[in-house]
Structures are given as C-alpha cells and as structure tokens.
Amino acid sequence: MAYYRNPSDVTAMPAWQALTKHRQAMQDFSMREAFTDDPKRFSQFTLSSAGLFLDYSKNLITAETRDLLVALAGEVGLKDAIKAQYYGELVNSSEGRPALHTALRRPVGDKLKVNGVDVIPDVHRVLNQMTELVGRIHDGLWRGYTEKPITDVVNIGIGGSFLGPELVSEALVAYAHKGVRCHYLANIDGSEFHELSMKIRAETTLFIVSSKSFNTLETLKNAQAARAWYLAQGGSEVELHRHFIAVSSNNAAAVAFGIREENIFPMWDWVGGRYSLWSAIGLPIALAIGMSNFKELLSGAYTMDQHFQSAPFDQNMPVLLALLGVWYGNFWNAQSHAILPYDHYLRNITKHLQQLDMESNGKSVRQDGTPALTDTGPVIWGGVGANGQHAYHQLLHQGTQMIPADFIVPIVSFNPVADHHQWLYANCLSQSQALMMGKTRAEAEAELRDKGMSEEEVQKLAPHKVIPGNRPSNTLVVERISPRRLGALVAMYEHKVFVQSVIWGTNAFDQWGVELGKEMGKAVYQRLTGGTEEPADDASTQGLINYFRGRHRG
C-alpha cells in the first residue's frame, strides 16, 4: 500500500537520514555570506507561477538542501499522493472519503467520478444556480417582504463557512459590486449579533445559512436569532423564504426552518469546510464581487492546481514551501510560522491560513492510526504589516526562537496615497532583509562610536543592539491583488498543507479534536442550565460551572 495511506518510518528513509547529517553541516551556515559568495543566489532560489513570484533565497538552504528535500518528497511517494488526491482516491482515511476541493475549480468537459458518478456536471450545475441567484440580487429582482431590493447579505456560518469567504470578499473589495453589502455572523456571542443588527434592515436583508448538517451549534443558534429578529422587525413566516437561503446537505432541516428547496445550495461530503470557499459556501464572495470575478478566482486556483501537478518538485511552489516548512520544523526545531501580509485588504489571510494549516496538520496520529514519529504542524500566526513591525517583529528579530516567515506584498495599491505604497513595499523588503542580515557586534559598536558615545557607553549598549540575523523568510510578490491571483495564492497554501501531511503521514482532511470539543460543550451546557445535576468529570470544570451558576443573571 502507498506510503500516503500506510506510512512507514519517514525518519529511517535515506533522504531523511541525509538531511539529518546535512543539518549538522549547516550549523554555521550564514545567509549573509551565501549572498556575498554567490551573486546568482537570488536567481537560483526564485520562481514564478500563476501570477505569483516567490523569492525563497533568504532561507537556510543551499542547492544541496533543496536536492535532499526534493529527494525526500520522492521517497514518500508525493507524486502518487498528488495524483490520488486529485483523482478522488480516499485520501481521508479516517472518514473514508476523497478530498476533492480541486474538482470545484475544474472546467466544464473534465471528467471525475466519485462512486461511479461524474461530479463535474454537478459542480457546474451549482455554479449556474449561483449565477442565477447573484444576477437576480444584483439586478434588484430579488425582493424582500416590502418589495424593496436586497441591499445587505449576511452569511451565517463558522469555521470554513466563514473564514475563507470573509478573506476573499474583503481582499477583493476593490471589485465589489455596488449596491450589495456583505456581512458575516460567526461567533455564538450575542454582542456580535447585536452589533450586526444595528447595521441592517430586515426588509432588505438576505441571510445565507451555511452549514453542511444544518445543525452546527453556533450557526443554528445565530440563524434562529436572525429569524426571531426578522419576525420582530415586521417580517412574516409567509415571506421568510425571501430572506433566508441555505448552503447545506440537509435539505429537510433547511426546509423545516422555512427555506424553500429551490433556495438550498448543495454541499458534498468530499469537500472539507476549510477547503470549501470554492463551492456554494462562496456565495457571499460571488454576491460581493460578482459571478464573473468569482469564476476568475476559480480559474486562478485551477492554474495553481495545474502547476502543482505538473511542475518538477524543485520548481514547484507549493512543494518547495512545504519542504521548507519540514526543514525548519523537523530539523531546526521551529515551532511556529508567521504570515505577514503587507496589504490592508489581505488582513484576514492569517486567520484563514490558521484554520487551513492548523486544523489540517494539527495531528499526532498518522493515517494508519499509529503515533506520529515527528513533530507535525506548526502554530500559524501573524498579521498585517507594517503594524506588526511595532509589535511582534521584535521577537522575530531578537527572540530566542527561530520563526520562519512568509511576507506577502503587492506591487500596486488600489488606493495610492502620495508615496505610501512605496514605503509599505520598502518596509516589507527591509524586514526580510533585516531578519536575514541582522547586525553584528562590530557593526553595533561602530554605529555607537559614530554617534560620539564613550567607549564605556559603547560596550554597555552594544550587546542590546546586536541582531542575530540568519532568520529565514519567503517573500511572495503579486502585481496587484486580483481574483485570479488570490485564487492561486490560497490554492498554493492548500497544496502546501497537503504535501506536509503526506511527508508526516497524517490526514489533512479530518478534525476529530474539534468534534470532541463540540461533544463536551453540550454536556457542560446541560450542567450550566440545570438540565442535569450530575457533576462534571473533573473538579475544575465543575467548580467553574458552580461559579457561573452562582453569579449569572439573565
């Protein structure tokens, strides 16, 4: 059986053993010296595809490092795993399912069978259904209970039904369709619903309830709150169908809620939530930017899919990024990875990538049920630059941990103000440069002497001004954020995550830890509300329940 389904000991593979020795040889490697010694280093460690330009030259690597990492990808059978995932094999072993989010962006005419049925016609049927709905709303033909056109769309969903769509609709706000505003309601916190309700009017609002089961607790509670609010504002049960539609595989529950069957968009069990923005879950995206731009998003992702499948591993963007992550996580003991977008409209990409990466690769068990033999997924964190430079970048530069980083920056701003974007771009490049170069003790001392300080003051302050440098980063550059390029960018990270799961032997498409929390939450709720007097399984949880019950009013 293939390694990706029944993994052996990856640490015993020749390439892994060679990488272990190579890591020791790289202990004193200096990126500064590497750039000085090799004027062609930049050209050797850059590539472009699907509208993205990747500079990975500021990494603790040589050509030999890359060769060994690529050899590891070959030894774990990555090529076969990529093909298996793309053509619908059961790569999600714990749930016995394929993982076919890539099918959502495949063109008409392609064929892909799941359980003997070609799914591509269904994919495009749903796209046509979305096109019709989006057209009616944008043309003012979909009317609320007072016959006024829809002006606001509220997506009710959580996790993958929220993070991906929010990222894309906000990243592409420059492409927004005038006349329709999109909002997101995710958290089961009354304050979020309250704040939203102050911005919309029931008579001109359409709610999209996005839940595969139509039973996700947070989503269902928010949908019920929205329904009650709609009725309290003057809406009626008879006209409910004008204001609520659903994306779900549980038609019966959606119909019972009051949604007409023709206004229910399907979900398939071969698409995981965190990979679902390409499906009808992306309805708020299409409503925000228009269906033609949504299809451009799909097209960009498809272009990256083709690159991922066909490019040699040493020229394959997702594969190289994945291998670099393995290099730092498993051989340099890096525990986290920073995502640093230098673009205001990409401010939510870190949140989406947190779910994509950490929910996929936050695993300690391999596909066959045996314990993982290596560290697996890192903590993903970060935020928009240049704000981070005045917050956590200090830790990146002078902290004791190695934290690789991805800088993401466009060349062109949609909203140029004086020379702001030149400064933003300069800040992005200078941060990656500073991480790589650092500042030596000799440089720090010389700098202080040039300021006229006494030698005593120089020796006292110089240690604090030393920056270790040699901190790795990648820089991803796009000409400007467009639907096509954003689609390619998100798809690239999806593929990166999958590659790492193959190497570690884990399943990137389940999330049993999330399920446990849901189950326990129901039991705690029953104890909080007096539904059961049976004590919790531990004294801490029971003590906190008692504390709540003794003080909660309302």
UniProtKB/Swiss-Prot annotation:
<protein>
    <recommendedName>
        <fullName>Glucose-6-phosphate isomerase</fullName>
        <ecNumber>5.3.1.9</ecNumber>
    </recommendedName>
</protein>
<dbReference type="InterPro" id="IPR046348">
    <property type="entry name" value="SIS_dom_sf"/>
</dbReference>
<feature type="active site">
    <location>
        <position position="390"/>
    </location>
</feature>
<keyword id="KW-0413">Isomerase</keyword>
<feature type="active site">
    <location>
        <position position="518"/>
    </location>
</feature>
<dbReference type="GO" id="GO:0006094">
    <property type="term" value="P:gluconeogenesis"/>
</dbReference>
<dbReference type="InterPro" id="IPR035482">
    <property type="entry name" value="SIS_PGI_2"/>
</dbReference>
<dbReference type="Pfam" id="PF00342">
    <property type="entry name" value="PGI"/>
</dbReference>
<dbReference type="GO" id="GO:0048029">
    <property type="term" value="F:monosaccharide binding"/>
</dbReference>
<keyword id="KW-0312">Gluconeogenesis</keyword>
<comment type="function">
    <text>Catalyzes the reversible isomerization of glucose-6-phosphate to fructose-6-phosphate.</text>
</comment>
<keyword id="KW-0324">Glycolysis</keyword>
<comment type="pathway">
    <text>Carbohydrate degradation; glycolysis; D-glyceraldehyde 3-phosphate and glycerone phosphate from D-glucose: step 2/4.</text>
</comment>
<dbReference type="GO" id="GO:0051156">
    <property type="term" value="P:glucose 6-phosphate metabolic process"/>
</dbReference>
<comment type="similarity">
    <text>Belongs to the GPI family.</text>
</comment>
<comment type="pathway">
    <text>Carbohydrate biosynthesis; gluconeogenesis.</text>
</comment>
<dbReference type="InterPro" id="IPR023096">
    <property type="entry name" value="G6P_Isomerase_C"/>
</dbReference>
<dbReference type="GO" id="GO:0097367">
    <property type="term" value="F:carbohydrate derivative binding"/>
</dbReference>
<keyword id="KW-0963">Cytoplasm</keyword>
<dbReference type="InterPro" id="IPR018189">
    <property type="entry name" value="Phosphoglucose_isomerase_CS"/>
</dbReference>
<feature type="active site" description="Proton donor">
    <location>
        <position position="359"/>
    </location>
</feature>
<dbReference type="GO" id="GO:0005829">
    <property type="term" value="C:cytosol"/>
</dbReference>
<dbReference type="InterPro" id="IPR035476">
    <property type="entry name" value="SIS_PGI_1"/>
</dbReference>
<dbReference type="GO" id="GO:0004347">
    <property type="term" value="F:glucose-6-phosphate isomerase activity"/>
</dbReference>
<dbReference type="InterPro" id="IPR001672">
    <property type="entry name" value="G6P_Isomerase"/>
</dbReference>
<dbReference type="GO" id="GO:0006096">
    <property type="term" value="P:glycolytic process"/>
</dbReference>
